[in-house]
Amino acid sequence: MRFILYACFFLSGMAGLIYQVVWSKYFNLFLGATSYSTAILLSTFMGGLALGNHIFGKFVDRIRNPLRLYSFLEFGIGIACALFPLYFDLLFNLYFIVARGSIPNTTGNIILKIIFSIFTILVPTTLMGGTLPVMSKFIIKQIQEVGAKVGLLYFLNTVGAILGTLIGGYFIIHTLGIDFSMQLFSFVNLLIGVVTYYLSKRVSEDYTLSEEDAEKREEGYPKYTDTQVRIVLMMIGVSGFVSMVYEVVWTRMLALIIGSAVQSFAIMLFTFITGIAIGSYVIHRLIGRLKDHLFAFAVSEFLIAVTVIVVLPLYMRLPYYFNIIGGVIPRTDSMFPVYEFGKIIICFIAMFLPTFFIGMTLPLASHINTRSISRLGVGIGDTFSINTLGNLIGSFVAGFIFLPTIGMETSMKVGILMNMGIAVVLFFYTSIHRYIKVLVSLSLVISVIWLSLYQFIDKEYIQRGNFRVRQRFARSFEEFKKLKDQERLVFYKEGKGSLVTVTKSEKGTLSLRINGKPDASTGFDMPTQIWCGHIGVLLHENPEDVFLLGMGSGVTGGVLATHKEVKNIELAEISKEVIEAAELFKEKNYDVLHNPKVKIINADGREYLRLNPQKKYDIIISEPSNPWMAGVANLFTVQYFEEVKRHLKENGLFVQWFQAYETNDRILNIMFNTFGKVFEYAYVFAPAHLDLLIVGSDKPITLNRERIIKKFLDPEFLSTVKDKDNKGIPDTVEKFVSMNLIGDKKYQIYYGRGDEDLLVNEDKFPIIEYEAPRAFFVGRTSDIIFSIAETNMSYNYSSLFTKPLIKDSFKRMGMNEIIDFIKSSEIRGQKIVSRSGFAFIMDNNLDRENIYVINNHPDLLAYYTFIENYPSEKDSYSKDKCLTLIGIIKKYTDSTTSIFYSSQSPKMLSHIDNCIELHSDLYANKDVWKIYFTLGLSDKLKRLYENLPNQTGIDEKDRIEMLSYLIKHYYYIEDFEGLNSLLPQIDTSRFKDPEVIRILKEVRGSEKKG
């Protein structure tokens, strides 16, 4: 029977943690994705557990059959969770009726949220809280067994929670949805209820004991005084408080190191409770041999502080270790579990030792507090209840007071000192020698002094977001740390929900990071930030009222405000710190924070719309674009798009920013299909390489020729797109048209009514949030939209232009020689319609009302298409043609993503081989050297080097540059034999490249030491 009960308790812990994970998804819909919402969920959850510990701990001491009560608890949990999706929807709708018109996160709004949260999960969580004291009452027969058996039950329940963390974080939510997940695992509790009820009928023993029986079972048990017990209860509450301070700080810090994907948070929780589980198991095995449990409790608290201190110096090395892990793992789908295991290693380094000793504290405190077998339920229940209340207060104080005011580092130091303080207090109530008490007190004083002097978090270093780096780029930790010197930290603010930083590069480029993830900048992001604000205004006939979700750098909001026809802008930003940081971007965002047109709302934008159904807008813009980050994917669901649609005026437009990088075709298809379920008509634009802007409406979108051309003639408008620091911003009518990838008609064919064969992303079926991190890990780009843009189909642009924009735009890339081929293909109906390109109207009797967009825009995909289509005949490789071709290939390989494409472009290398074969002097062409270096082609570089002596008339500067490529290549692939073979022929003084000089000094230095 006992084995079956242990199995039931294990499964109960698993189901409980799955419920917690699933409830967090419900609460995000209900309360918004804010730190207040997370705090309310934790408070309600832990409050319910504490209440259950206390109520059922008292109640179980008065009943004859604890196992039957346990079965009723499991029945209650199962029924409540099975019905949860039904009554959640009722309360969800009721909340938005009652809270209508309120501002999110004001005092009244938060009180309402707390009230409704209590109604949603207080019943099942209270029942969950009762399971441990009730099961303990049934399992424990002797008072001497309390600590050991509580430790075992705690271990089993926690191991179940570990399994629940993995199931909830990786498997069920995106495959079953949150409603079905809830109902499915409710059957686990119902099954446990059935099994334990059946077993309870076989129990004949009366668990209400007489005083005589109780005294027999308590013989030989060490008695602690009332004062000692009160101190232990007080200290276990403080210990619970400190444990949650650590967890909150670790979660914030580790998110900066391993990223903010939903799986990353599951791994952090997995590691935290694994340490607790192992600690509780070890104390379960040891507790029977201990003579003084109060002393053991004090030592555990002392060791928590010591182990946190021990791992402090490692925290700043964790990004370096994770870079090593991420740099050696191949970026394929099949290796994603290995990458996640790498995250576990990082989290274990940070958390395991302290959580191991945290796991010992509750069994020890329960053992001390339970002084009578007849009051066993009260003893265990009160211990767990007080500890859980400490958890509740600790999570709230850490998230809302400590992090925003004193930051991660000081919060951790406060936790260490509190653990030391707990240990000192407990030691003074033990019978140990006073010299030991003095030593422990002295250690507290030393800790205070040491912690006040030692700084273990380097702000510039920790905020860099190294989890995005896909290759190892430093050979040592010291070299890795120096990379931070490339940027200067100009803003650092820890808030309730995130760490927000702004850095400035040597060139003056500002970058905004949220939890380490670059979110906006005055560099590469500018084209998309600017056009995100412009594009809706250009396509709407009378855009007076605009709602913008997301501040970022403030550039989009500032650009919007420059349009005279735009009268009112409401800008919702969830992070107060991001709003503050936008002040640093005032030169680029037109001082948006102080623009009278702009109303800044510090709230969850989606919740704000839901609470204000009466508000209508001409344009709504949604800027967040990284669905792999936890919480952001809520802005890419059918229900969110429907909410947006309800807030659009007639002929209103919705602009959504999405990226085609760090994703895959499946995710992009799901996203567009989800969008198409709500918005039947849309245009897709690409203002920058792999950044997409989708403009949707429930009515056909008309491109007004006169309005667009008039805008481009407006000096004020032109001043916003002609940025002296960013030459790549589309700033002409031609470039505006070239941004368009998919027009209205083609969009309708592919996505306009939602393809039934494709999945959609829903609030209660969040596919993207769970699949996007895998695509982010692989790090590829999706070209599905570009492929659709290239399909053999011409489409009409509503007669936007009636005469050619650029008669022969191929001249921009030296492609004149294949113009005739393209034209003849068009005439034969083999349309080459674009990824992104300049629009022009073909001659040769083509319909002049249609604009054909072809592959002639100078970006990666256009070059790739040109290289693939370049003819391989011998007469295509004249010297001049080869030089042009090699120049195009070099530009292509200089792209950050070109290596991915090169594996699919064998023609590229064959073109170079053919040119070199026909023109041997190309062995000394530095562009060829650069191409082979970029692609890491050792054999090709060696071949060039071997033939270099045969070349005459080489400019010495070019020769040095070519050798530099070979030196760096050998060094990067760690071919030191090849590098040493070059040394006798190299005069270091001739090289100007700092990296090459450093390499040569390092290698020659190693040679001398050898």
For every predicted segment, state its role.
Residues 834-841, 848-854, 860-878, 885, ...:
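Alpha-helical repeat scaffolds
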Residues 705-814:
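SAM/dcSAM-binding transferase cores
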Residues 878-881, 885, 921, 959:
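Residues that mark the junctions of alpha-helical repeat units in TPR/alpha-solenoid scaffolds
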Residues 818, 882-885, 892, 925, ...:
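TPR repeat positional signature
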Residues 1-711:
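Alpha-helical transmembrane segments of multi-pass membrane proteins
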Residues 837, 881, 885-888, 928, ...:
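Structural register within alpha-helical repeat arrays
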